[in-house]
Amino acid sequence: MDQKLLTDFRSELLDSRFGAKAISTIAESKRFPLHEMRDDVAFQIINDELYLDGNARQNLATFCQTWDDENVHKLMDLSINKNWIDKEEYPQSAAIDLRCVNMVADLWHAPAPKNGQAVGTNTIGSSEACMLGGMAMKWRWRKRMEAAGKPTDKPNLVCGPVQICWHKFARYWDVELREIPMRPGQLFMDPKRMIEACDENTIGVVPTFGVTYTGNYEFPQPLHDALDKFQADTGIDIDMHIDAASGGFLAPFVAPDIVWDFRLPRVKSISASGHKFGLAPLGCGWVIWRDEEALPQELVFNVDYLGGQIGTFAINFSRPAGQVIAQYYEFLRLGREGYTKVQNASYQVAAYLADEIAKQGPYEFICTGRPDEGIPAVCFKLKDGEDPGYTLYDLSERLRLRGWQVPAFTLGGEATDIVVMRIMCRRGFEMDFAELLLEDYKASLKYLSDHPKLQGIAQQNSFKHT
């Protein structure tokens, strides 16, 4: 054997990964790599790059889960090669999916299904779930208008401050979005402004049960009652879809007396994130319809796929079944009792943070993390006319130096001059961890006080309100 080949072969077998030839070059980023490399070297390169990501457990901007127990990891590993869409090939995974749909429908007080199976589907998140709910609204509205012999070319959707997915829905499906703007002192959709935006071309009204900007609930019942009066006055019947991305897996456990779900007759569909307060890993959402009549059959496809026939009304197709299976694990593992305990713990942390932060500066709280107010989030602004010598951007930047990702951002609509800070509390952010945040919060304030020349230089950062 050629001596050079022998040397190269020996090196590939025996060299430490940090002595390997492949690791001495910059990893390819613009062209498809020409040559292979050892698996341990490729892993090391990628693993090292990922250290530059933020620590997910310290990410207090995200609504998504950042803690999962070992059994979830095991179930995800077992399901990594199971395609969720292949119902015939993976019938038990499909059965688990249907069980979850029934459980979520029961949680949200959907009427008992005629055939024993609730109407709904798993999605990759609440955004896809919103798209499906919006499509069904448009189709139902169009059918009503066609039956009345009226034009269907100018549909509109009425909402308050919503996630970006509703802007996408409006653009992709050619619907006018009538978003009730945030105003100082009026940050959410109210019955009066909602009714002013409605007409016979309104396909539906979408309250956000857990507004992403602040964490507060947009309570559906007052809006629902206003739509009842609107119909009595005008004859126009308008449906509701509840975007419960966060609140859908909170209120049923910690604030069951809030009437927000299918107990309201106008609510035809509800969407939520399983991977937020549903406690599932990333990539899980749910949309449930009141009954079969609420989901137009034109949106349901029966297709041949890999030897089987399936009915599907999701936008996405192939994806792992692990997220659904992990969601089912959480439902079984915790039940109503366990979910109530976990969610209450997050609210207790939020209340503690709100109380302690209130002592640190001239703050006005928009959300204090009470179960009857919204999700377990703390959102506040500097009081009008107060100048503590720093901005919330400065504070956010200082906290980030300690690894904490606490967003400061402006509100939307007509309230863009209002800067808020928002802290999300969720499973895994326990009381002791919150105390560490407070210590760094106080240290950051002291630093800003001791270095006044640095105050006010931080710019609006890249955090998004979602």
From Swiss-Prot:
The record's annotation in InterPro entries points to: Glutamate_decarboxylase (IPR010107), PyrdxlP-dep_de-COase (IPR002129), PyrdxlP-dep_Trfase (IPR015424), PyrdxlP-dep_Trfase_major (IPR015421), Pyridoxal-P_BS (IPR021115)
The record lists the catalysed reaction(s) as: L-glutamate + H(+) = 4-aminobutanoate + CO2
Q: Per its Swiss-Prot or TrEMBL entry, what cofactor is needed?
A: pyridoxal 5'-phosphate
**Residues with PTM N6-(pyridoxal phosphate)lysine:** K276
Tell me the leader sequence span: none
Q: Is Repeat one of the keywords?
A: no
Which residues hold pyridoxal 5'-phosphate? S126, S127, T212, H275
Highest taxon of source: Bacteria
Keyword tags:
Decarboxylase, Lyase, Pyridoxal phosphate
Top-level enzyme category: lyase
Protein role = Converts glutamate to gamma-aminobutyrate (GABA), consuming one intracellular proton in the reaction. The gad system helps to maintain a near-neutral intracellular pH when cells are exposed to extremely acidic conditions. The ability to survive transit through the acidic conditions of the stomach is essential for successful colonization of the mammalian host by commensal and pathogenic bacteria.
Annotated PANTHER family = GLUTAMATE DECARBOXYLASE
Q: Which family does it belong to?
A: Belongs to the group II decarboxylase family.
- According to UniProt, the name of this protein is Glutamate decarboxylase alpha
Q: Which organism is it from?
A: Shigella flexneri
